[in-house]
Amino acid sequence: MKRILSLVAILLVTGQLTYAQNDTIWRTGGLLSVNFNQVSLSNWAGGGENSVALNGLANLFAKYKKGKIAWDNNLDMGYGIVKQGEEKIRKNDDRLEFNSKFGYDAYKAKFYYTVLFNFRSQFAPGYNYPRTDSSRYISKFAAPAYTLLALGIDYKPKDYFTCFLSPLTARLIIVNDDSLSKAGAFGVEAGDKIKQEFGAYLNSRFQKDIMKNVNFMTKLDLFSNYLEDPQNIDVNWEILLSVKVNKFITASIGTQLIYDDNTAILIYKDNNGTKTPVLNDDGTQKTGPRTQFRQVFGIGFAYKMSGFGIR
């Protein structure tokens, strides 16, 4: 599998160096937004706490198209913090993902032989709240990180839709932290910092103004590991709906659903509205893969960078 990784990397880098010349044509653009939410209460009979939240996101793209060559790049980033009552500041969003596809036209500019590279991680340490001391973090930048190289076919019937399918995909799970790797976090063997997987991969993305001042984006990633429990498919599905109120104000709602068979999550049961840990026979708390879900809504400043060409 290391030979496959090396071959795919050489093909990707060679193709990018060959075609990224001065006579190329690029289209670039994206969306930048900052959302702010604040609640202030004084002698409020209904109860509640003061809160402040700030979220920022960026969805950027750079696309090259000339002759039979197509090269698409997407960078998606998100980070958010919230302070509620007397609690310390906590993050409520943290995403970093880069996706690059280099393709050669196979049929009528709709099907492309494609090499894909994907990197996904986060910016800052994550904690199992309310414990936020620096020794209790459960994730950080590059712990985990997911890198993926794939050979396959990309279907691009329209500029706003693409669906890539690969039966030959190498994926690395990286846990670049001693304490987390010793604990065997995110599916690596205890003491190891890298887990290698080989399987099938699907990557689909749709982004379009579905009506005036309304932009809809959704992307779906599916991965099946041939080497271990291929029936347990990893899922990463994101949706972002943005509604432009005026030139600079935008309302947006985003969701993300993740299922990762390598990620062990603490298991709780609902006991009359109270979360109660589910314990093993030895008294330790049970862990296992679970469906993760995140939803963010906000109103704030947004700037849409319309695509422009560079020749």
Predicted regions located by residue number:
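Residues on the lipid-exposed face of transmembrane beta-strands in outer-membrane beta-barrel proteins
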Residues: 30, 34-36, 56-64, 98-104, ...
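Membrane-embedded beta-strand positions of outer-membrane beta-barrel proteins
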Residues: 30-32, 73, 113-117, 151, ...
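Transmembrane beta-strands of outer-membrane beta-barrel pores
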Residues: 34-40, 66-68, 77-83, 117-125, ...
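Extracellular loop and loop/strand-boundary signature of outer-membrane beta-barrel proteins
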Residues: 43-48, 83-88, 132-139, 187-192, ...
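Residues that define the transmembrane beta-barrel architecture of outer-membrane proteins
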Residues: 50-56, 92-96, 143-147, 194-200, ...
